[in-house]
């Protein structure tokens, strides 16, 4: 009989987007409990060791973290298995680098470098708005932040811009047709496009139709949509490819063209 929480994670059972090879060991780092779900996060150790290649082993990552060099959303994190997730800002003071975790079109977290100015804020999706004790209204975001006394105009599914220094809302984007969004779940994960319309299905899942910059349309559930810009102007910088997914044939042609130009 299992008593208590699970403490291990086998490599084969780890999320695909961590891109860990099967043969280098049996286990994978199990993310600590935190603001993002196990299958939607990237542990700090995977980011530093496997993506940035700043360390060769888990031991080295621990030494980096214990020197308090790594900040996530402006807070020092010493836990190597801390679950960083979508929209989180990872700052390395020593090298003066800042990264934002956003998805590429293959549905993996891209190593996306950002400027110092952009590292001062993040976007959060509003998951829930409730009235707490003594009638205090508050909203809960996708990364488990609770913010009291929000603007009454802000509703569920809107996006709020948060100042990481103070934790306060500095701006917000309504969930509306014509606004730019990124897909954060499902088969279209990582695609960016403009919301064209929303189908309401009471008792089931609402469906949102999105059109990308190439004119391709696709549909996904409302829960998978994260608004990232007013009109077609994004509030964050996007990774290479700008969230436009190519077809298999287009991708092959592009690869051959680069091969010929370099060869």
From Swiss-Prot:
Domain S4 RNA-binding: 42-104
CDD domains: KOW_RPS4 (cd06087), S4 (cd00165)
GO MF annotations, alphabetized: RNA binding; rRNA binding; structural constituent of ribosome
Record keywords: Ribonucleoprotein, Ribosomal protein, RNA-binding, rRNA-binding
InterPro entries: KOW, Rib_uL2_dom2, Ribosomal_eS4, Ribosomal_eS4_C, Ribosomal_eS4_central_region, Ribosomal_eS4_central_sf, Ribosomal_eS4_KOW, Ribosomal_eS4_N
Keyword RNA-binding: yes
Superkingdom of this protein's organism: Eukaryota
A GO CC term attached to the entry: cytosolic small ribosomal subunit
Keyword Cell cycle: no
Pfam families on file: 40S_S4_C (PF16121), KOW (PF00467), Ribosomal_S4e (PF00900), RS4NT (PF08071)
Gene Ontology terms describing biological process: translation
PROSITE patterns: RIBOSOMAL_S4E, S4
PANTHER family: 30S/40S RIBOSOMAL PROTEIN S4, SMALL RIBOSOMAL SUBUNIT PROTEIN ES4, Y ISOFORM 1
Family per record: Belongs to the eukaryotic ribosomal protein eS4 family.
Name of the protein this chain belongs to: Small ribosomal subunit protein eS4, Y isoform 1
Originating species: Pan troglodytes (Chimpanzee)
Higher taxonomy: Eukaryota, Metazoa, Chordata, Craniata, Vertebrata
Record gene name: RPS4Y1
């Amino acid at each position: 009989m299992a008593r208590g929480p699970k403490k291990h994670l086998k490599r084969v059972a780890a999320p695909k987007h961590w891109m860990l090879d099967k043969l280098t060991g049996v286990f994978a780092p199990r993310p600590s409990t935190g603001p993002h779900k196990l299958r939607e996060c990237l542990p700090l150790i995977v980011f530093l060791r496997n993506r940035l290649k700043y360390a060769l082993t888990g031991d080295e990552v621990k030494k980096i973290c214990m020197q308090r060099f790594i900040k996530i959303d402006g807070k020092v994190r010493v836990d190597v298995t801390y679950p960083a997730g979508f929209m989180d800002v990872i700052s390395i003071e020593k090298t003066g680098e800042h990264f934002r975790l956003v998805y590429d079109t293959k549905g993996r977290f891209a190593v996306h470098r950002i400027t110092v100015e952009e590292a001062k804020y993040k976007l959060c999706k509003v998951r829930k708005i409730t009235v707490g004790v003594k009638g205090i209204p508050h909203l809960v975001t996708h990364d488990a932040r609770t913010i009291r006394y929000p603007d009454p105009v802000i509703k569920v599914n809107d996006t709020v811009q948060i100042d990481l220094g103070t934790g306060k809302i500095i701006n917000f984007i309504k969930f509306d047709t014509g606004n730019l969004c990124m897909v954060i779940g499902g088969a279209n994960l990582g695609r960016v496009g403009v919301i064209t319309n929303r189908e309401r299905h009471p008792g089931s899942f609402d469906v949102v139709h999105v059109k990308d910059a190439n004119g391709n349309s696709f549909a996904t559930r409302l829960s998978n949509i994260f608004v990232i810009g007013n009109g077609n102007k994004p509030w964050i910088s996007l990774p290479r490819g700008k969230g436009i997914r190519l077809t298999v044939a287009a991708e092959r042609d592009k690869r051959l063209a680069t091969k010929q130009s370099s060869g």
